[in-house]
C-alpha cells in the first residue's frame, strides 16, 4: 500500500495508506456515521464531488454485492449505476470479506471504478475537525507526488448536470394510480422504488427539462436535490 495524505483547507494533515485506485483527487470532505451501507452511500448521487469519511471503525468486511438491475431498470443493491463520491476515507479497511451476496472486495470495486480509498486515518478525529469547523475542501496526495494540486471548487462543476438523467425515463407507465413528475437533480433509486411500491407512475426528467411542450398531466411534482456549494 502506498502512503497517502489527506490535506484539509485549514492545513490539517491526516496520513494513511491507499487501498483503492491511486490518483490524486480533491473535493469537499464530509462524514457519514452509518455502521453499514457503504455500497449504497458511495453510489448516492448526493455525494458527487465529495470525499466521504466513514466514522465506523471497520469497513469492507462484508464486501460488495453484484451490480444487477431490477425489471424496472433500477439498481438492485445500490443507489445508482456507479460510484459518485470522489474518494472514501476509513479507519480500518478489511480486504477479507464474508457475505452471502458479496462478489468482490471494496478495494477491488474502488479500483474498477477508479475511486481512491484511504485507510489508517483517525476518522473520528477528522470528524471532530469537520464538526467543529464545518465541512471543508480537501485533497488527497500520494507520497511520491506533489501535494500542491489545484484546490477543488464547486463553482467549476455543474454537479446537477453530472448526476441527472439525460432523457425522460418512465416507470409503471400507464399502470400507476397516480402520476408523479420527478425532476432528477440527483435522485437515489430507492426514492423511485418507494414511489413504485405505492402504485405510482413516475416520469423522471432531466434537471433542465423543457416543460413548454409537456404532453401529460401529473398529480404531483418532486424535485430531488444534490448538495451544491456556491
Locate the predicted segments by residue:
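RNA-binding accessory domains that recognize and position tRNA/RNA substrates
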Residues: 1-212, 225-227
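Cysteine-nucleophile active-site neighborhood
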Residues: 216-230
Amino acid at each position: 500500500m502506498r502512503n497517502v495524505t489527506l490535506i484539509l483547507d485549514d492545513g490539517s494533515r491526516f496520513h494513511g495508506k491507499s487501498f483503492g485506485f491511486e490518483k490524486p483527487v480533491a473535493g469537499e470532505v464530509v462524514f457519514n456515521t452509518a455502521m453499514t451501507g457503504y455500497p449504497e452511500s458511495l453510489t448516492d448521487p448526493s455525494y458527487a464531488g465529495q470525499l466521504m469519511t466513514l466514522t465506523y471503525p471497520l469497513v469492507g468486511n462484508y464486501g460488495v454485492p453484484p451490480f444487477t438491475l431490477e425489471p424496472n431498470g433500477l439498481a438492485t443493491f445500490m443507489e445508482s449505476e456507479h460510484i459518485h463520491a470522489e474518494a472514501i476515507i476509513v479507519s480500518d479497511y478489511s480486504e477479507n470479506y464474508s457475505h452471502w451476496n458479496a462478489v468482490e472486495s471494496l478495494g477491488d470495486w474502488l479500483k474498477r471504478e477508479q475511486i481512491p480509498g484511504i485507510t489508517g486515518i483517525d476518522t473520528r478525529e477528522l470528524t471532530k475537525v469537520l464538526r467543529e469547523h464545518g465541512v471543508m475542501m480537501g485533497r488527497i496526495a500520494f507520497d511520491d507526488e506533489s501535494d500542491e494540486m489545484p484546490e477543488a471548487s464547486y463553482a467549476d462543476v455543474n454537479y446537477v448536470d453530472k448526476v441527472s438523467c439525460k432523457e425522460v425515463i418512465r416507470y409503471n407507465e400507464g399502470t400507476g394510480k397516480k402520476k408523479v413528475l420527478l425532476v432528477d437533480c440527483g435522485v437515489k433509486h430507492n426514492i423511485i422504488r418507494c414511489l413504485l411500491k405505492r402504485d405510482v407512475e413516475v416520469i423522471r426528467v432531466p434537471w433542465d427539462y423543457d416543460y413548454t411542450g409537456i404532453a401529460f398531466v401529473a398529480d404531483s411534482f418532486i424535485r430531488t436535490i444534490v448538495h451544491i456549494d456556491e
